[in-house]
Amino acid sequence: NKVIRFGFRQSIAAMNLKQEETWRVKFSEIPSPLQKTGMSIALNFSVPVFVGNGFQPDMSFHFVKDEKNNTVLMAKNNGKAHFQITKFSIQDASGKVLKDIDTMKYILPDRHVSIPMDGFNTTSTKGLKFVMASNASKTSVVYDITEN
């Protein structure tokens, strides 16, 4: 067993952050050169670290067409904290699911991501909603999909 601890030289409050700050901590296991027989597995993974108190994301969603005329959902974060997208659906005004997407993305402050909507086409975004189950509560996170 290995325990790894890390921290900051000053408190988060002393950093005077204007928005949430983000780091990616990478862990790479180096295989032992002494073990020459059999198979060895070296782990290599990274973990996002988000630092800041009281900051909130401010999300907007709209559809665009890519160079092959496929529908793409643009998710933009105008807020001061990251937003995590997981499994979500596109629903109409009555709550009917039009498309389910299973993905995992982080959208950092002042950034956007493009999410391909394979097989989904629409001529109007009127009444369409981005609906995602919230990990923090039993309610869903719901956003209107706006015209571009």
Q: Each predicted region: which residue ranges?
A:
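Short acidic/proline- and small/hydrophobic-mixed sequence motifs that coincide with surface turns
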Residues: 80-85
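A generic structural signal for beta-strand entry/edge sites
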Residues: 68-72, 112, 127
